[in-house]
Amino acid sequence: VGSEMCIRDRHKYLDGGVADSIPSAWLFAQGYGRNIVVLTQPAGFVKQPNSVMPMLRRVFRHYPEFVAALEHRHEVYNATLDDLARREAAGEIFVVRPSESVKVPSLCREPDELERIYQIGRHDAEATLPALEAYLAE
């Protein structure tokens, strides 16, 4: 929501992640046999309603569909997480997620903080690799 509106061929575009934060439905529609979904939040994460919705309603009042997407984003996100959990339990997909909450500002330029987060990701990837290899070998 912090990004600027993009205009292309006289159409206005905003961050597509608002309407479809985890585009897994598109992925499954492609019909691939093995699917890997990479999440940015640890297991058990639940997205909460946006606390600044009153302000966003005013700022984007001329874009009612965008406001509706913002208002329901947490519901859609959480429903997608539920679907992914069901598919993961059934062995239909492999989900990669961080082992802990990784909170980093959008424009972080602190080398030590970026290194810390990188190391978490690297450790998690190495820990996940055997299970991922087994999933892909099935």
Residue ranges, per PLM feature:
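Patatin-like phospholipase
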Residues: 3, 8-138
